[in-house]
Every structure is written in C-alpha cells, then in structure tokens.
Amino acid sequence: VETKELYYPQISAQAGSYTFEEGVELEIYSSKSSYYDWAKIRFTSQFRQKLSLKKKDPATIQLGYDGTLEDVFTGFVSGNYDGGTYANEVALKDEMLLMEETIINDTFLDTTPQELISYFLAQAGLSKMKLSSKTYPTRKMLPIRKQTAVQAINAVNAAWGLRVPFFFSGGVFYWDEKPEQKKVYTFERGVNILNLRRAGGVWELETVSAPFIKHSHKINLIHPQVSGEVEVSKVVSKTNDSGFIRTYIYF
C-alpha cells in the first residue's frame, strides 16, 4: 500500500499533430457504468491557434509529476475541427469510437462469445484485448444484421444471457475482466484527501491529480467517515478554477 507524495503536477495533451502543455484546461471522464471514456481539451484565452483536426485523429492525455507522466486517456478526436474556425475545445472519445463506426452484418455459426468479440474488434482494427476465460457453450447460429460492433457485443451478451461489463482502459478492451492493478494506493485525511463527501448515494473523494487511479481498481482509505478498502466506480479529472488538476474518485 503506497501513499503518493504529490508535487509539481504536469500535463501533456496531444490531438493529431498538436501537443499542448499549457494554455489548456482538461476534463477526463471514466466510469464503470459508461462503456466509453471521454475527454475535453479546452483552450484558455492565451491559446487561439486555428486548429485543423479530423475525426479519428489519435489523442492522448497524460498527467503526472516531476517529469513522470502517465496516460489518463487514450483515444481519438470525436469530430472534425476545421482550420478556418476558432474552436475553444476539442472533444475526444476512447477506442469505442472505432467500434461505434464498425458495422457487423453476418450470420455466425458454431461460435463462443469470445470468438465473436475478437472478430468484432478485428473488424474495427483493434487487437489488444482481455476477455473472460470462462467457458461458454457454442451457439449454432447467431445472425447480426447491420449493427455497430458495440450493438453486436450487446447482442452477444443477450444471446448468452450475460450481463457483463465491457470497456477500454489504456487502449486494451476488457470484457468481463478488470485492468491489472499493481498497487493499492492509500488516501488519508490531512495527507492527500482534499475533500470527502457523500453525494447521490455515492462517496466523492477530491484529491490532487491522480492519473494512476482507474475505475474498477481498489483504493485504501484512512478517514473518520470511511476506512478500509473500496472499489472505484468512476474517476473524473479536471482543471479547477485556480488552474490546477483535481481528481474526483467515486465509490
């Protein structure tokens, strides 16, 4: 269990051929209940360059300290930004954008859920995946008609009577699996918890920039109101009014 000492936060946001290390505000949203993560790069008044970005240009947002940056978002620009217009923000979506744009139209014979999902990912040009190793019966026939790859995964879940989560994290597709967690971070009152409040049936913990916390991970809390290990349901990192990144962890 590790308590991170957090000083000198840094940011780096890349979209297409542009890299921003200042003059931008960020918002990054990642939740168990949403199958895709999204982010926004907003330009502050100093930055008024004309942007030329195309939908599906690659995008990465990194946060960190003392020169060590971690990916907090990987994905793509979610729309076209024409050089002739002043855009004050760029919207990004993770790899699920490619799945939403991939159409599946086929009848599948003698298949398992994992075989189908691997095929849908390949059709979207994606190969990094971690799929449940549980054994499911093969299905004699499953017709999928003009559905996006996301709808097709939902059709697979329904066909086998499964309610299992699927999402991308760090560019890897997970189906009924969780991203590996190398260490459990500790959040302690007076050390790295800026605020802890109960809102809408969940706890919201405000801390400084914490790019290493992902949804479905466990964290350890030392606080009079809550203590022990909890599982993270949502992580939102954004620039506050003073220009500092704050991470909000929900559980």
Show which residues each predicted segment covers.
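LysM (lysin motif) carbohydrate-binding repeats in extracellular/periplasmic proteins that recognize
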Residues: 127, 163, 226
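A structural signal for the main folded, soluble domain(s) of proteins
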Residues: 59, 86, 174, 218-220, ...
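Short, compositionally biased
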Residues: 75-83, 142, 231-242
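Short beta-strand-centered interaction patches in the first periplasmic/extracellular domains
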Residues: 2, 87-97, 130-199
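Juxtamembrane "anchor/assembly" segments of surface/extracellular structural proteins
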Residues: 1-52, 95-97, 179-251
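Surface-exposed cap/loop segments at beta↔alpha junctions
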Residues: 44-127
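Extracytoplasmic/secreted envelope proteins and their assembly/folding machinery
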Residues: 74, 114-118, 150-154, 213-217
